[in-house]
């Protein structure tokens, strides 16, 4: 499954990043963090800064809504910012793929001992979807498929994030006509269905 961010064509790619930042802020608020989105401090911009309400731990979050593979230097820069700002943790949240080198760094980092590993966490599509499911922000794609009552699903179901709502986009194959139709389910109101036919 993948996650796509959708903005009006008149808006900048910065707006796309803000959708992801806002989503991360919502998830952190659920986890008892006080959140500030997009702050500028000497020498850096922080997409999301959070401080835990109970234990006062601090968290810097770098959000990347890129379609191209994320380069390894993004990870190095985030880790440097965590150390420089004396934060307790850093999160890299990315809806796009990691480059080969970035995957290597992620793998190395996640094999460190628990104390070291706690300083940096990686949230790619699967982990973002898990957070959304566990927080109750979305229902599972399997639940959506059951509601659609079709036997011919394509495998590439997508979670589409917009400025205001989240949608599952489910390709349904029509074997009789050789077409694909897309059904979009609004997360908060399962009764509302929008169907777009692609010919």
Where are these regions (language model features)?
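Mixed-charge (Asp/Glu-Lys/Arg
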Residues: 1-199
């Amino acid at each position: 499954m993948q996650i796509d961010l959708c903005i009006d064509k008149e808006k900048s790619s910065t707006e796309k990043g803000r959708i992801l930042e806002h989503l991360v802020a919502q998830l952190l608020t659920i986890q008892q963090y006080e959140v500030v989105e997009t702050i500028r401090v000497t020498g850096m911009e922080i997409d999301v800064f959070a401080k835990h309400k109970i234990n006062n731990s601090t968290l810097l979050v770098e959000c990347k809504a890129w379609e191209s593979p994320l380069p390894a230097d993004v990870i190095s820069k985030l880790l440097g910012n965590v150390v420089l700002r004396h934060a307790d943790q850093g999160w890299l949240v990315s809806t796009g793929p990691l480059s080969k080198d970035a995957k290597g760094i992620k793998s190395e980092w996640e094999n460190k001992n628990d104390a070291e590993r706690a300083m940096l966490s990686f949230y790619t599509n699967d982990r973002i979807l898990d957070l959304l499911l566990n927080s109750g922000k979305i229902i599972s794609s399997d639940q959506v498929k059951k509601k659609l009552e079709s036997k011919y699903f394509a495998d590439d179901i997508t979670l589409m994030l917009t400025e205001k709502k989240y949608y599952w986009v489910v390709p349904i194959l029509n074997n009789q006509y050789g077409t694909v139709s897309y059904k979009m389910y609004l997360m908060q109101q399962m009764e509302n269905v929008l169907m777009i036919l692609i010919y």
